[in-house]
């Protein structure tokens, strides 16, 4: 890398060769190569129409390709079972009649991985396969069964690759060429068993995380959005059923701890008509807590659930050590200090289900126009079963010996 230092007085110095008027910023629109597009659609249609039980899986690059609507059109036209990768949750409507949940290998929504991995053809639209999304590279997928559609490139069955083909154009054209085939969804529907519910809490019993998320589920509507912090909230928020119009943000490309505090600030500022519900662990919050100050200055009405379990729980499952136990803070006291009597802010600390119900009622009632900070005290070992499975697999992948090649 090279750094060029320029004196602060130099950029404004005029010169006769410079245009006096500002040059308008514009990006030339990208266009598909028509011959490549037609060839890619022809090859994909031939491949998928021969399959017995094909499926569709949406990935996070649907957003950058602006192809979510085209992907849903393809699902409507084809009748294929429809799943999403974890970081694409919220980009595909979960009320779609053929939606089968999140495909995340061993920690997928119940019955979803079995349907996807047993399919004889799968189309992935905008996937990212890294150690986290592949659960330590343990996905049971075969490249020769897959069509990989990237924002400007299509690869058919690990063979022919077609460049300069935009995802949006490809999916729309492919929808017109596929035969209707709902075998995979029918198989899913046949074996599906609804989720169970958490055990009922005894009076004043210490709050369990699965009980807390049962109550968060009831808060969701088209007027809310969920921000899931890196950590166990990844897995608990994945299991939330998003109503139509409910926003959702989830970052796992880098596993960035603390990202959700700033993301909550930005989302609430960009979409003021929605009430943001952020689920943040105590370890993550310590990294970026100061962003709450700007939330208050901007008059945001976010609900933050600070899940205090005394450490970096996700890191414990990947690689445990004394560094994963953190100094406990008085989190509500910290937010009260940041509030400092300016703006609308309400904080509380809850230890049991009764207190949680009361806090949610207050946050969605009398304090609905305030930033609400609810610190939830839970046991340090209270994790989702998905984190236990995922952590074991990622830990094994991370600790494997280096490849000599």
UniProtKB/Swiss-Prot annotation:
Its cofactor is a metal cation; thiamine diphosphate. Keywords: Decarboxylase, Lyase, Magnesium, Metal-binding, Thiamine pyrophosphate. Binds 1 metal ion per subunit. Mg(2+) binds at residues 282, 309, 311. One of its GO terms (molecular function) is thiamine pyrophosphate binding. InterPro entries: DHS-like_NAD/FAD-binding_dom, PDC/IPDC-like, THDP-binding, Thiamin_PyroP_enz_cen_dom, TPP_enzyme_TPP-bd, TPP_PDC_IPDC. Residues 232-314 are annotated as: Thiamine pyrophosphate binding. It catalyses: a 2-oxocarboxylate + H(+) = an aldehyde + CO2. GO terms for cellular component: cytosol. The keyword Metal-binding applies. GO terms for biological process: aromatic amino acid family catabolic process to alcohol via Ehrlich pathway. Its EC number is 4.1.1.1. Substrate binds at residue 315. Homotetramer. Belongs to the TPP enzyme family. This is Pyruvate decarboxylase 2. It comes from Pisum sativum.
């Amino acid at each position: 890398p090279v750094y060029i230092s320029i004196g602060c007085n130099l950029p404004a110095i005029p010169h006769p060769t410079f245009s006096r008027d500002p040059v308008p910023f514009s990006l030339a629109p990208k266009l598909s190569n028509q011959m490549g597009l037609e060839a890619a659609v022809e090859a994909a249609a031939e491949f998928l129409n021969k399959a017995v039980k094909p499926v569709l899986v949406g990935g996070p690059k649907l957003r950058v390709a602006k192809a979510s609507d085209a992907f849903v059109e393809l699902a409507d036209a084809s009748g294929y079972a429809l799943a999403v990768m974890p970081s694409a949750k919220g980009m595909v409507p979960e009320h779609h009649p053929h939606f089968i949940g999140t495909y995340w290998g061993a920690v997928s929504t119940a019955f979803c991985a079995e349907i996807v991995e047993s399919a004889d053809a799968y189309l992935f639209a905008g996937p990212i396969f890294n150690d986290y999304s592949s659960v330590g590279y343990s996905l049971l997928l075969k490249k020769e069964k897959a069509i990989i559609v990237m924002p400007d490139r299509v690869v058919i069955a690990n063979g022919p690759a077609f460049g300069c083909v935009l995802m949006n154009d490809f999916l729309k054209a492919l929808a017109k060429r596929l035969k209707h085939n709902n075998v995979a969804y029918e198989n899913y529907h046949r074996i599906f068993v609804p989720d169970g519910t958490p055990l009922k809490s005894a009076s004043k019993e210490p709050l369990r995380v699965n009980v807390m998320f049962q109550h968060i589920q009831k808060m969701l509507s088209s007027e809310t959005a969920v921000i899931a912090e890196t950590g166990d909230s990844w897995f608990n928020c994945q299991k939330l059923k998003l109503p139509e119009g409910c926003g959702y943000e989830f970052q796992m490309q880098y596993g960035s701890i603390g990202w959700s505090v700033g993301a909550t600030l930005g989302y609430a500022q960009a979409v003021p008509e929605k009430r943001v519900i952020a689920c943040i662990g105590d370890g993550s919050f310590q990294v970026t807590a100061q962003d709450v100050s700007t939330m208050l200055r901007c008059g945001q009405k976010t609900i933050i659930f600070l899940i205090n379990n005394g450490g970096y729980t996700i890191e414990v499952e990947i690689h445990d050590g004394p560094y994963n136990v953190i100094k406990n803070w008085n989190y509500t006291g910290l937010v009260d200090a940041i509030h400092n009597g300016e703006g609308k802010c309400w904080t509380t600390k809850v230890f049991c289900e009764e207190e949680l119900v009361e806090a949610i009622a207050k946050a969605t009632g009398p304090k609905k126009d305030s930033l609400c900070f609810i610190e939830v005290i839970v046991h340090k070992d209270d994790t989702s079963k998905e984190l236990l499975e995922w952590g074991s697999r990622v830990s094994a992948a991370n600790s494997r010996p280096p490849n000599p090649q």
